[in-house]
């Protein structure tokens, strides 16, 4: 456990020594701070100079990582050891994008051979849709792709297709359906033509309640309009491992793309779950996405901790969570194409590390994953940045931006990028009472009024942030960015001694929903309901009589 590691008391002592130190003083005294706390991996860079740390902090954090045998645990993941201990599974999402030819054997399966076989089928299918060779039941080309999934079968593909819209096929419109409330699927069905739509049903077991409910609604709608169930074969494909259920649905087994237990849902966009990505972007751009992630994998595996991007981000996060007692972390992308990135990272981070039981089954006496949240940075400045600047919470921020200007939007990117730098500087530097008072007096305010108002215009500063810069929003850079966060999450899971690759927390609610659904559908259940739940069930039934 973290609190039992030999470096932990050293970090506690160091925290007491520097907790009141202000970053603006460090910048003032150290002219090389920005260049020393800056790491670049090809066209992705991290400026971590605006953090409440110094060389001693980093040295101790690296010692902490060594206490946990982080290097050895990184290797264990890449080699296919069953580090997902509660489910007795390997964790090999890295194999999905590996360019290495050294085979990984897992329970007598050749992992890379299996992965590349599925990728080959995905490429052939993608080419047939994009080229117009794959036609619908009336011989129309496919114009709309509807991805039906939830969680990891939805968020990754949605985020990547949105982020890389400039690389998408101009004929294809992408639609993503995850919510079971009925509104989302019906809204999509109103917009599309059954004769030119391809549905991708993404569910490993092909039994996920939300996904199957939406898929069956889409199936019914399609059959009513096409007039024959046999046409399903041309318009529905599955990403699943349950061949029997897929065939019962009406999907040709040749249109089923498999993935494996060694790939968790939130790590699966690189697998057949990314079929919608490949169709939209094409195999060349999908390969670039994989290559960017592989580049980050190799960096994570081989770079020394001092210049290792995921290690640095992971350890800095631990520094705030477990020593400054920070409870929250903000993701602030300054690019409209990255608008879904915060909620993708929400799932990746909180479903992985939102746990309180150690690998040995013991209750952990320290905080683990913070609440991860975020929004488009420029919009957030006019919404919740007030709390970040002058509120009572310490909330570290990841600013994410690109250097590349958007075509046909002269002056826009300069305004956007100036705000990234200004906000990061403001969070670091702040504004003192004396500075605020001087500004007000310079504007001609009465001295007594200025003294009162100046208190409200103070910015304490010392708010930490990272700045992640991409040269441009490209497939390879998005691949590297996602892999960076995947590995950051892994680093923190190792430090906290938790299993980052199960998600038992999603199970209880699903179990309890079964008897409640029986009651709502008019059937009697033998389950016990607390008085509140029972009252709300009756309220629903009475309203819908």
From Swiss-Prot:
Pathway: Carbohydrate biosynthesis; gluconeogenesis; Carbohydrate degradation; glycolysis; D-glyceraldehyde 3-phosphate and glycerone phosphate from D-glucose: step 2/4. The active site is at 351 (proton donor), 382, 510. CDD domains: SIS_PGI_1 (cd05015), SIS_PGI_2 (cd05016). GO terms for biological process: gluconeogenesis; glucose 6-phosphate metabolic process; glycolytic process. It comes from the Bacteria. It catalyses: alpha-D-glucose 6-phosphate = beta-D-fructose 6-phosphate. The keyword Isomerase applies. It is found in: Cytoplasm. Keywords: Cytoplasm, Gluconeogenesis, Glycolysis, Isomerase. InterPro entries: G6P_Isomerase, G6P_Isomerase_C, Phosphoglucose_isomerase_CS, SIS_dom_sf, SIS_PGI_1, SIS_PGI_2. Catalyzes the reversible isomerization of glucose-6-phosphate to fructose-6-phosphate. Belongs to the GPI family. This is Glucose-6-phosphate isomerase. The gene is pgi.
